[in-house]
Amino acid sequence: MLLMPNKDWHWEYNETCKQLSISLGSEMEFLTPYKTKLLIPDALTATEFNLEHAKFYIKMLETLPKVLHISDAGIVQTALNATAAHFLLQSQMPKSWFFDVSDECVYCEVGKLFQLNCGYSKVLALVVDNGLQAATVMILSQYCQLSDSKSLVQFDTIKVMHNRLHPLRKARQVVAA
């Protein structure tokens, strides 16, 4: 069962964990992975989960099950983190140099999945914010080693130029007659 937003939802900064959270009513809190240094100033105080946030979240709930084969709980977790990343994280400068250039031109939009190639590893990424030449993506794979000293884990965000986004390949089945 997918969790639908209601009037009791609001964003909070969890002082104990030093992370953004969302209160889902009087007895439930969802802790995002986003720490203080990544957040916009408004995210450090209680903030309404407004209509725009709800529309984005619901769009993610509708889109993600069509492209990801994960549990309902995983869909909700991904949608909540994507909503937090879209509205409450500071903007970033592109860090495209970590990723290989794609040979194909892609159409990029929020909610679309792409592959990022980093050396020998390939990671799944969800577009959470899109600009004219670059997109902020949220990593959906468990881990991505960018360099000897830098790595990304699931739900981390990074901004990359559109030419680094590789389209997902669909498995093709050849049937011989």
From Swiss-Prot:
GO cellular component, one term: cytoplasm
One family name in Pfam for this protein: ZapC_N
Main localization, broad class: cytoplasm
Keyword field: Cell cycle, Cell division, Cytoplasm, Septation
Keyword check for DNA-binding: no
GO BP term, example: FtsZ-dependent cytokinesis
Cellular compartment(s): Cytoplasm
InterPro entries, per database record: ZapC, ZapC_C, ZapC_N
Subunit structure and binding partners: Interacts directly with FtsZ.
Purpose: Contributes to the efficiency of the cell division process by stabilizing the polymeric form of the cell division protein FtsZ. Acts by promoting interactions between FtsZ protofilaments and suppressing the GTPase activity of FtsZ.
Family the entry assigns: Belongs to the ZapC family.
UniProt-recorded name of the protein: Cell division protein ZapC
Organism this protein belongs to: Shewanella frigidimarina (strain NCIMB 400)
Gene for this chain: zapC
